[in-house]
Amino acid sequence: MSDERTPQRSSGPRKKRPFQRRKVCRFCADKQVSIDYKDPRTLRYFISERGKIIPRRISGNCAKHQREITEAIKRARNIALLPIAGSHASQ
């Protein structure tokens, strides 16, 4: 009975995922670039078009700088330097 319920795996060839190089944190690579909530031009790079914060696996930031970016984006939203919703959400 338990054999009937378990899904069988296909014995076909497995798809290989192309290897992508790990992105380097731009703030660790260049120490002169700083994270500042008063600089919306830099922070917009880390916000999707829907207004969501881009995760670190996509942006390539380290955990420390991703936390700082998240905090800076939230501060900038709070004082209306960045929109809370995306740029085309009001349409």
UniProtKB/Swiss-Prot annotation:
A GO MF term: small ribosomal subunit rRNA binding
SUPFAM superfamilies per UniProt: Ribosomal protein S18
Listed InterPro entries: Ribosomal_bS18, Ribosomal_bS18_CS, Ribosomal_bS18_sf
UniProt biased composition (Basic residues): 12-21
Swiss-Prot/TrEMBL keywords: Ribonucleoprotein, Ribosomal protein, RNA-binding, rRNA-binding
GO CC terms: cytosolic small ribosomal subunit
Residue numbers spanned by region Disordered: 1-21
GO-annotated biological processes: translation
Similarity comment text for this entry: Belongs to the bacterial ribosomal protein bS18 family.
Task performed by this protein: Binds as a heterodimer with protein bS6 to the central domain of the 16S rRNA, where it helps stabilize the platform of the 30S subunit.
Assembly: Part of the 30S ribosomal subunit. Forms a tight heterodimer with protein bS6.
Protein name per its UniProtKB record: Small ribosomal subunit protein bS18
Organism from which the protein derives: Geotalea uraniireducens (strain Rf4) (Geobacter uraniireducens)
